[in-house]
Amino acid sequence: MEFVADLHLHSKHSRAVSRDMNLPTMALWAHKKGLDILSTGDWTHPIWIREIKQSLEEAGNGLYTLKSQISNSKSQTKQVRFLLSVEISSIYSQGGKVRRIHNLIFSPKLETCEKINASLVKRGCNLNADGRPIIGLSSENLSELVFSIDENAMIIPCHAWTPWFSLYGSNSGFDSIDECFGKFADKITAIETGLSSDPYMNWQIKELQNRSILSFSDAHSPAKMGREATVFVSKNGNSKITYQDIRLAIMQEKQAKFKIGYTIEFYPEEGKYHFTGHRNCNYVQTPDQTRKNGTICPVCKRPLTVGVMHRVEDLAKDGFDKEVYKTNSNGVKWITDPAKIHPPFVKLVPLNEIIAESLHSTVSSQKVKDLFDKLCENLGSELNILLKVPISEITKQAGEKVAQGVEKVRKGDIEIIAGFDGQYGIVKIWKDAQIKEKQQDLASQLGIDF
């Protein structure tokens, strides 16, 4: 039995988040997406935690369900469950630098949330302004506060490589978990990859070798949910999962009833900070070019935003281990390490993007939305379609072009121009004039061939 979890989401009470990020709509989209466990998000916000208490009921195991469940004839196989999680932004000075670190907190019960909130308010933190509050506590002090209230809570550094707001961030982060979390470093048993890195990149970091690598969407709208996810698999066929099961699986405890089976990944090149560069100057560098040319923009002479790939290579142990690829019977390309000590992962392109490119349309167009809904209704869920449904069945429902797009995504047969300095990368299933032009520009700039 497996449970697909997206445990980093935001509510409508966070800045730049869709009004549709409410609990019933999130649950409805979870069925479309193929997600079993969702983050509530934002439980530090006074209005949102009140909505959580009004809309959810405890399932007796540290997870919560809607008091009235949404039903979907084909895609609902289990009740959608919610885990109490929140992202907190810590901005503080340490070691002569300003640090900006974002951490996820997982809570096993509402009582713990309320105690943490009360303690934060007592320390002068403003929890009303944003669902993702900004506080002045260091990561170490935040850990002390949380673990003194409930030792079963978890703290997970989120989007761990983002330049501006993360554990390893090139502009305001640290070089190690020990440096960031101090005496609580041993309690940090996992990190979240973020969109600009994947597990393979994180496997190169020595201190992450024995920690879990998690992936979640950080979605600000329902349609973005599940673009990254972590799948928990039962070791003995259990059909029920608890908060403690998730916690022990992440901690990789021997007595855990579940383990991390695999993760679902965004293409890291599509992330906003994969390469080094300056968006306003339209200038980008690969890690090799950055080592050669430095981190000053040749156009404006200001510091470049150092990308995630370069930062990973800076902190990595000597040499990168080789990726191992395996294609399963559904034509899906899986990636793992040579020793197979880490859970495998798969890189996907969202179904609505495949449909949009196939129809020469946009993801926001009504015809793309209609076909997406039709496919999820008739074939089970987005993740089921992307990973398991026979291509022949997709052809019957959506036509050859969409089916071919899904098949190409499963094989990893796509075109990518990496993102940099806050600009998303470009992913195309079929090479077009835009990709060719971008590749020619990049080749000219970097002196490489595509």
Where are each of the predicted segments found?
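Cys/His-rich short segments
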Residues: 261-334
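Extended substrate/RNA-proximal surfaces in nucleic-acid metabolism proteins
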Residues: 2, 50-189, 447
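Histidine-centered catalytic micro-motifs
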Residues: 4-13, 43, 215-220
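Histidine/acidic-residue-rich catalytic or RNA/ligand-binding cores of hydrolases
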Residues: 15-18, 49-53, 165-172, 203, ...
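Short, basic, low-complexity termini and linkers enriched in Ser/Thr/Gly/Pro
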Residues: 66-78, 234-241, 248-259, 363
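Low-complexity, acidic/Ser/Thr- and charged residue-rich accessory regions of DNA metabolism proteins
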Residues: 345, 349-450
